[in-house]
Amino acid sequence: MDSNTVSSFQVDCFLWHVRKQVVDQELGDAPFLDRLRRDQKSLRGRGSTLGLNIEAATRVGKQIVERILKEESDEALKMTMASAPASRYLTDMTIEELSRNWFMLMPKQKVEGPLCIRIDQAIMDKNIMLKANFSVIFDRLETLILLRAFTEEGAIVGEISPLPSLPGHTIEDVKNAIGVLIGGLEWNDNTVRVSKNLQRFAWRSSNENGRHPLTPKQKR
């Protein structure tokens, strides 16, 4: 096992612990809490894959971070912060829409790269809007937190979510998954639209519906 893979996991575990303390002291906002929950699932998956105990990894991660901070000068920290690009968090969904449980009458699930796509195939002849919460950097989608498909009545009929066991995804992964979701919904004569945020940062298209033409694979 690569030593850098292990040390990266250990540091991530400790930093997650620090962020959890921030939430416990009620200092974190909704996007901060969303990322914390998503990263918790990711760490569990990575720990299982690596065969490492999260509690033990957190202790070692603390030692690594403390050693780095001891060697870090204030001036170097200022320069690092000034040069690092800042990401933005965009929210199409409310906390209620993001956390709501939903059920499928005719469930279909497909894995597309590091993303899981779920569609209720019982939904027909509906107007559907895709909404997502995600971060943006350099004017492009950085990390998808969650994407959901809503009917005009507010029912959830589809979803795209990152797989905890496969952390990390690209904008192309997200585009492909959106194409599969749209294709599955349109198969049952539903009309699908994409939110303005998704159109701008993740689904850049040239047609009048704000979408790329779907490939035969995505239409299935």
From Swiss-Prot:
Q: How is it modified after translation?
A: Upon interferon induction, ISGylated via host HERC5; this results in the impairment of NS1 interaction with RNA targets due to its inability to form homodimers and to interact with host EIF2AK2/PKR.
Cellular localization per UniProt: Host nucleus; Host cytoplasm
Under the heading Pfam families, the entry gives: Flu_NS1
Residue span of region CPSF4-binding: 180-215
Q: Which GO MF terms are attached to this record?
A: protein serine/threonine kinase inhibitor activity; RNA binding
Could you tell me which residues belong to the region RNA-binding and homodimerization? 1-73
**Subunit:** Homodimer. Interacts with host TRIM25 (via coiled coil); this interaction specifically inhibits TRIM25 multimerization and TRIM25-mediated RIGI CARD ubiquitination. Interacts with human EIF2AK2/PKR, CPSF4, IVNS1ABP and PABPN1.
| Free-text note on domains in this protein's UniProt record | The dsRNA-binding region is required for suppression of RNA silencing.
What family does the database annotate? Belongs to the influenza A viruses NS1 family.
Know the name of this protein? Non-structural protein 1
Organism of origin is Influenza A virus (strain A/England/878/1969 H3N2)
